[in-house]
Amino acid sequence: MEKSWFNFMFSKGELEYRGELSKAMDSFAPGEKTTISQDRFIYDMDKNFYGWGGRSSYSNNVDLLVSSKDIRNFISDNTFFVRDSNKNSYSIYFDIKKKIFEIDNDFSDLEKFFYSYCSSSYLNNRSKGDNDLHYDSYIKNTKYNCTNHINSCIDSYFRSYICIDSNFLSDSNNYNESYIYNFICSESGKIRESKNYKIRTNRNRSNLISSKDFDITQNYNQLWIQCDNCYGLMYKKVKINVCEQCGHYLKMSSSERIELSIDPGTWNPMDEDMVSADPIKFHSKEEPYKNRIDSAQKTTGLTDAVQTGTGQLNGIPVALGVMDFRFMGGSMGSVVGEKITRLVEYATNQCLPLILVCSSGGARMQEGSLSLMQMAKISSVLCDYQSSKKLFYISILTSPTTGGVTASFGMLGDIIIAEPYAYIAFAGKRVIEQTLKKAVPEGSQAAESLLRKGLLDAIVPRNLLKSVLSELFQLHAFFPLNKN
């Protein structure tokens, strides 16, 4: 464990280096040379240190003396020895990898080095000068400022290292409300001496989470969703699940897609009570098939990997089937095949346009050849729907659409539409490379590549999908029931 200095020196003299602390820390990239002295640099915090949100300064009139090494390496796994203006000394220990943060009074060897440093020529040469009263009051107020500086450096490091959202940790003018500060200081603002304060991060390293106050996923998951690409937050009321910051398309549940496409109050589900009965008594060492079905049902609230029913799209009656990837990867078993078959037959009898939204990993292996037969069964009723009745079927491919679904009804639409950046394939990249011993070009299985090769008719963004479908139906003589 490396031991380093984290000392605060107080003076009224001329400063050698000025600027915002955040800029100073950003300038010390790993392996980067600086023009500042390799031993130490003095930093002016007077009216120059601002909050993450650009608010008023947290502390004033404190000069920070630290090593000029990279601030991230400086904090990542070190022990710091700190002394305040009241001669109180303590050590701070960080270990990012083990997620440990400790404050301790046991400084032993560090204390000797500290006092030898305090007697150095730098401190002895600092004179009070003429403004002694100002200097004394300046020193008396440094305990609070010193604490805030420690907190500021800690927060700044964690913000850059763990990508903390500034609006999450700093949402007021009072720095004392920050999460890190609450770990260091008690309500009275005094330094705590207890040990083993722990800081934990979530899987995406997007923010710091306190079990009581900052558990966003538990308290606010009904309001916000997090982008799995840039980790930005999106308001759930915007129902298209497209990141406003990076444009990434997030997965949508079948219920969300129905709500996005179907007019409110017009959805009539079909065959909701149909469940799988484990037809081949599939044996698994890890988890029985029935247990997996039960677990998926509890997680998703669905009976199987597809929802079917009828409703109105901008006033136009339609038959709609939406697959849900959350339910065992959207795999197609006997229940999925039967529900889609019944939906197509109903649409044929009622002369309704048909929409099938695909999101699947393919046939369900736990049902063996029965799952493969669903490909032929659905294709058969679609042939009657399209060829005999001359009705209109639109296939919508979302990410991912693979395997037996791609090889059957996914590619049988009169119009085949895909979402932007959707992954569409029969066999996955890994399977192809292991079978053919050839590398699969990057992006060759993306919707944009398939559109260029003529396998798709269009790529339609989610926010335009409903209006595009409405126009396509009207072009094929399917009109709203009530015209205003």
Swiss-Prot record:
Co-factor requirement: Zn(2+)
Residue intervals of the CoA carboxyltransferase N-terminal domain: 223-484
Catalytic activity: N(6)-carboxybiotinyl-L-lysyl-[protein] + acetyl-CoA = N(6)-biotinyl-L-lysyl-[protein] + malonyl-CoA
Gene Ontology cellular-component terms listed: acetyl-CoA carboxylase complex; chloroplast stroma
Start-end of C4-type zinc fingers: 227-246
Compartment(s) of residence: Plastid, Chloroplast stroma
BP GO annotations: fatty acid biosynthetic process; malonyl-CoA biosynthetic process
Official protein name in the record: Acetyl-coenzyme A carboxylase carboxyl transferase subunit beta, chloroplastic
Species per Swiss-Prot/TrEMBL record: Capsella bursa-pastoris
